UniProtKB/Swiss-Prot annotation:
EC number: 3.1.1.116, 3.1.1.3
Record PROSITE patterns: LIPASE_SER
Activity regulation description: Inhibited by the 1,2,3-triazole urea covalent inhibitors KT109 and KT172. Inhibited by p-hydroxy-mercuri-benzoate and HgCl(2), but not by PMSF. Also inhibited by RHC80267, a drug that blocks 2-AG formation.
Localization per record: Cell membrane
UniProt xrefs under PANTHER family: DIACYLGLYCEROL LIPASE HOMOLOG-RELATED (PTHR45792), DIACYLGLYCEROL LIPASE-BETA (PTHR45792:SF2)
Name of this chain's protein: Diacylglycerol lipase-beta
Disruption phenotype: Deficient mice are viable, fertile and display normal physiological behaviors. Levels of 2-AG are reduced by up to 90% in liver. In contrast, brain 2-AG and arachidonic acid (AA) content are unaltered in deficient mice. However one report describes a decreased by up to 50% of 2-AG in the brain. Disruption of Daglb results in depletion of 2-AG, AA, and prostaglandins (PGE2 and PGD2) in microglia and macrophages, and also attenuated pro-inflammatorycytokine (TNF-alpha) signaling in response to lipopolysaccharide stimulation. In contrast, lipid profiles of neurons are not impacted.
Modification Phosphoserine occurs at: 570, 578, 582
Active-site residue list: 443 (charge relay system), 495 (charge relay system)
Any one cellular-component term (Gene Ontology): nucleoplasm
GO MF term list: lipase activity; metal ion binding; monoacylglycerol lipase activity; triacylglycerol lipase activity
Residues exposed to the Extracellular side: 39-58, 124-128
Amino acid sequence: MPGMVLFGRRWSLASDDLVFPGSFELFLRVLWWIVSLTLYLTHRRRLDCPGGVLLSTYLIVLLVLLAVIICTVLAIVCVSMRGTICNPGPRKSMSKLLYIRLALFLPEMVWASLGAAWVAKGIQCDRTVVIGIIATVIVSWIVIAATMVTIIFVFDPLGGKMAPYPPCIPEHLDSNSSNRLLTGLKTAAKSVWETRVQFCCCCVGQDDNTRVAFSSTADLFSTYFSDTDLVPSDIAAGFTLLHQQQDNISHSREPPEVVTHTPGQPQETELDAEVENCHHYMPFAAAAYGWPLYIYRNPFTGLCRIGGDCCRARDIEYDAVEGDQHNCHFASILKTTGLQYRDFIHISFHDKVYELPFIVVLDHRKESVVVAVRGTMSLQDVLTDLSAESETLELGIELQDCVAHKGIAQAARYIHRRLVNDGILSQAFSVAPEYQLVLVGHSLGAGAAALLAIMLRGAYPQVRAYAFSPPRGLLSKSLYEYSKDFVVSLILGMDVIPRLSVTNMEDLKRRILRVIANCNKPKYKILLHGCWYGLFGGSPDNFPTELDEGTQGALTQPLLGEQTLLTRYSPGYCSSDSPLDSPTKYPTLYPPGRIIHLEEEGGSGRFGCCSAAQYRARWAHEAEFSKILIGPKMLIDHMPDVMIRALDRVLADRTACVSCPGQGGSSVP
């Protein structure tokens, strides 16, 4: 931090990012130089063959060129190790060294081309020497190609637009010119992000919904990154420091007092009943993912189990299946739920932006009509997730501020139209009129199921929804309170998705800036220690962060320090209305319903692969998920199969200890 300025533009590469790639190149070049020197010294007396003078000259010049490159790369690595993330002063000579290093590519390319031309002439010399020359030519071009790929990756399309402007634009321009300039920069940033999103999702169709999703996603990213000059390695270092800081705080904090029951809060028996319901309905949410999740959960036997059904010819039994040409999804759903053919009302695997797959089945054990919505599993689903603007819902209920996540609300409306207008629910209740409507889903599907329950509650007052790992940024405060009567959310451990919202991402950005500003260690040490700590553990106290007196004074006010550092060290980036010091354009949204948190108690290894973990179920408040936690299980805990195993474990433990007093967790209103 900040990104380097080379050739008059900013690049997505900091001057302290070259320790690891430089060390790797240094190792490769030294090894290359030793091999070339050995080859020359061993075979120099055999180079009296036709064309041997050319090969001898090639090796001598190559050795000299490699020596110069090695010295330059060594200097780059040494300079890159100096200073800290927010103190690039000791690395001010880095740009000159990089200019020298890039200039050395020209003679290297010329010499590699000459070597290839000379070898192509069919020089009649010792075969070992010729093979060695061919190897050096190949390695030269591999290094050059790798460098070109790296340049493409660190190229910042906005670097040329932002770098020439002074750091405080409003002081140099009148208000109208300043506003026009900032508007132009924001438009350019959004255009660049939209191009990136379209490139990443090039296989997604180009209908109206997709174009709207592209624009919404680009707007989200351009707004989020508009006021920072962070490069990707800065974010990785910030995650590492936050992980250790978070563990340090949790180790020093006293264990929370367990409250089994207070007046007006849910009884422990209700918690047991809801955990059992979650255990029952989670397989339906998992089944909505179809055969990919089934194969993932059963890697050795899954294909054999559903293979026969995949190859079976479609007959009348499959009339309710939509978008499953080879019946593999249907076969996996049958295996996952254990239901019969006659229990399925409708299965849709139609998948577009704002249009999610879902299944409708009859659950005779719980006497319910279950609608299971699939979570994120395609690029279309990702675009739905990232359409994070808020949208007002017309629900016909006496509530103010009925606002929800736009993408998920659109998906819920689509399923609502299908269920109601296409008569799918009417068909289900004509078969089982006394059954209760239950909506379930995981991840994105959990958010859609919760919103769908809100939309259907007027027609089905007894509707229930079970949202497994729902996104946090879903409902406004009023809808969150309203949904508590009929929605239960289940969150496992450190799962990042139930903590993920635009406001929480803003908070994470502030915390990253603060912890980077506080740290006086070079980036390479932060990343090395972070990898060791993440893999093997250790004490976070062994990696202190300190501040000098001047910076400490600047950081006495919240966010002032990192904001000062940004304006001080980011000449190319400027924002007069930075999201860091102004209200976010995205309102605060909340997860749906009452929340059950499955907390890990037993040790299962840092990645959950060493032994079976022990979990404790308890009622939790949404405020407990108002910060994103950094840890090795923040993604693992979101996987459906991990949640199924955790529920199996919780239910088994509760069944075994049903007579033990004091079991269970705290209750939160």
